[in-house]
């Protein structure tokens, strides 16, 4: 077991487990209906969670935008400059195994402190990392009460802004969708089930008119020159590809009259 899981191995030595009072950085919340209790810890640093985090990535459910590599890089290069302080919530079972990770942060403003997801505007999807055993410990009906307890344990915040949350995380329902105040965005993302081959999928999803327009677009593209798919291999090629991408997107943003996200620090 990693040091972080050993830390919670003997539940009787944790103050929250003996007197049931919530402390600043750890709290034991009992869930009803004879379900196991959940130990919640709050972490203000990302790096010490690396081993537990990456292990949960491999065995549980999450999106690419909740991986340790993504979140730690964002916090290091962007979050710190924006004044966002990590307030990462980890839920543990009675054996010291991680049940879930909520990569949250506190954005400190002049008038108020805002609770939000780490990753900011650069993540397409915001969600918890969930162990495959999560639903055995906390049911959808129980999660709102657990969330209320979590918020009491988190650092002071006045506003909660949780956006871009998918209905499902991997094969599991997203427990965050059980909370009050959740509203579907008018530009909600869509998901689709892929088939064994492209032709079957394309034939099912596109009408004859759409296919005709696709062929016309392809012919116009070919008039500009040969079309090929190239995967950059070396570091220099990858950087050059990103530079070209950002340059082209900047031109597109200017033409559309929208803010250029690449101008941000």
Which sequence ranges carry the predicted segments?
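Generic hydrophobic/packing signal
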Residues: 106-108, 129-132, 154
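Non-catalytic accessory segments adjacent to catalytic cores
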Residues: 137-194
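Short beta-strand-to-loop capping motifs
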Residues: 130-133, 192-196, 233
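Short, solvent-exposed loop/turn segments at the edges of secondary structure
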Residues: 120-125, 185-187
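A conserved beta-strand-loop-helix scaffold within acyl/acetyltransferase catalytic domains
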Residues: 36-116, 165-188, 197-265
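A short, internal acetyl-CoA/4′-phosphopantetheine-binding micro-motif in the GNAT/acyltransferase core
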Residues: 121, 128-137
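Short, intrinsically disordered terminal tails adjacent to the first/last structured region
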Residues: 1-34
């Amino acid at each position: 077991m990693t040091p972080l899981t050993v830390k919670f191995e003997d539940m009787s030595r944790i103050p929250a487990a003996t007197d049931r009072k919530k402390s600043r950085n750890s709290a034991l919340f009992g869930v009803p209906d004879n379900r196991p209790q959940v130990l919640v810890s709050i972490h203000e640093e990302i790096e010490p969670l690396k081993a537990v985090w990456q292990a949960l990535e491999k065995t549980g459910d999450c999106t690419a935008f909740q991986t340790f590599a993504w979140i730690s890089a964002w916090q290091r290069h962007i979050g710190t400059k924006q004044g966002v302080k990590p307030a990462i919530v980890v839920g543990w079972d009675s054996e010291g195994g991680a049940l879930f990770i909520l990569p949250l942060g506190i954005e400190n403003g002049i008038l108020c402190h805002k609770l939000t997801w780490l990753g900011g505007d650069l993540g397409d999807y915001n969600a918890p990392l969930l162990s495959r055993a999560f639903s055995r410990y906390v049911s959808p009906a129980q999660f709102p009460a657990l969330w209320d307890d979590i918020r009491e344990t988190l650092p002071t915040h006045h506003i909660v802004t949780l956006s871009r949350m998918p209905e499902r995380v991997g094969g599991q329902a997203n427990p965050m969708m059980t909370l009050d105040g959740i509203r579907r965005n008018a530009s909600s993302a869509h998901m689709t089930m892929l088939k064994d081959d492209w032709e079957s999928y394309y034939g099912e999803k596109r009408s004859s008119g759409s296919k005709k327009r696709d062929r016309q677009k392809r012919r116009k593209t070919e008039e500009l020159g040969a079309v090929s798919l190239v995967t950059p291999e070396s570091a220099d090629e990858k950087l050059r590809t990103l530079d070209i991408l950002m340059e082209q997107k900047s031109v597109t943003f200017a033409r559309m009259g929208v803010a250029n996200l690449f101008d941000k620090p």
